[in-house]
């Protein structure tokens, strides 16, 4: 019985971990071999688990808004961010990995205030 139970339990644990591993596989959604730099105005920022999301209207204003995923709220706080570090209307520069599917989605690796 023990020889049969161990592989079943092991398989169950592996299957339970798979969604978490897939969720955190950055390279499946974003092209980590290249980065983009965009300047624009913060439209909104959502501090929600599992990730902070920043919505940006690019300076050219002809393009649709961009959405940038960041780390978890806890990770952003550990990196020195506060809930009011960036506010609606702030002009920022975002460096990000673009979405593989060509959508206006990216994973932000750096966000900083811009002087225009």
Question: Positions of the model-derived regions?
Answer:
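Conserved hydrophobic positions within beta-strands
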Residues: 40-42
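A short macromolecule-binding patch
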Residues: 61-72
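Short nucleic-acid-contacting surface segments enriched for D/E, G, S/T with interspersed K/R
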Residues: 77-94
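OB-fold/S1-family single-stranded nucleic acid-binding modules
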Residues: 99-116
